[in-house]
Amino acid sequence: MNGNTRTKRSLKNMQTALLFYIINLVLAFISRKVFIDHLGIEVLGLNTTATNILGFLNIAELGIGSAISYTLYHPLFEKDRQMVNEIVSVQGWLYRKVAYVMILGACILIFFFPLIFKKMELPMWYAYASFIVLLVSSLFGYFINYRQIVLIADQKEYKVTYCVQGGKTLKYILQIIAIMWLMHGYVYWLVIELLVSFIIACALNVIIKKEYFWLNTYPSKGKLLRKKYPEIITKTKQLFFHRIAAFVLSQTSPLIIYAYASLTLVAIYGNYMLIIGGITLFVNSCFNGMSAGIGNLVAEGNKAKIKSFYWEMVAVRYWFASILCFSLFMLTNSFVSLWVGEKYILPQSTFILLLIYVFIVCTRVHDLFIAAFGMYQDIWAPALEAGINIGCSILLGYYWGLNGIIGGVILSLLLIIFCWKPYFLFRSVSYTHLTLPTTSRV
């Protein structure tokens, strides 16, 4: 693929992601405000907690998608359709295994809901219904539209974005209407969540069939085909540890907050995390569209071009992060006051800690390059990151509450993400060929 085509597709991915980012961010804020006003802060806290528990089950995905994406760069670059079919068949087989593990784990977890939600004042069916609907919605991706990875690896992620984010826009609008105008609004909210998720999965499958008419995958043959592609299993095993660290970073803080406080504080923290999540999603929308392009660049093997592009990305992302953090510092509390009320504003010290977290997350340039090279062998790093995160969050949270919990998260990010990962990338690249290896065959 020539540089112009790569740049064009990257820009199209970025533009599409940015468009839907703005639309869905606005709708997410409106939806959350409507949720609080019409259903109450505790229902919102319950929904957040159920999402975090589901995130725990999603660890079972093990990073298979990232491993598959890495192994698809070369056959797509070489236009090897047979290899693409076989690799995605392996993915389908692995995803079915993951789905069964998630279902089993969910069945076990449900028995503990009376203990997990014993402080909740809502009827217990709220917890069961919320969790089951979110679980089924998540399972659609494992059974129906797992093949979207081909579009993403082929730098056509904008088509996935149109379908998924367009469907999410429709979902937000329908859920807002249901909560505001219908009795038993939360029941309709859950029905819409499930129905739209199913429609999105089916629509995406139609797009994939139209775009890749030659893509014929057979998950039932995945068990045999995986022996031809040991790289997938190797990378998946390595990525498992990285997935755990990512889960700990994104999902455990609300659970620890709930353990020390209440669903109300979880929801207040969630309000700020919606803003922060919106900012980080904005940065990712601008830059993650380049991920397949970086993989394609690595496949070319031009060391000087890769190094030059890396430092350009560093400069741009640090500039972006600085401006965004300053803007957040000046505007966030005023916005929260207007949005949901002054009683939902966090203390200034807590807010400063959240800004430090935002800056570190928004400057993670190395992640895209590590993914393109498939360098996941530092399995001790995410294990240590998760250990520091959980251990320090629990310990510091006991003494300093929410500030201590966020401080534990920041400490783990500083040591592993800010210090180790850039060093690991440059050290590893210095001792390896700058070409994407072909997937080995037996």
Where on the chain are the PLM-derived regions?
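Interfacial segments at transmembrane-helix termini and the short loops linking adjacent helices
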Residues: G3-N4, L11, F113-V133, L328-T363
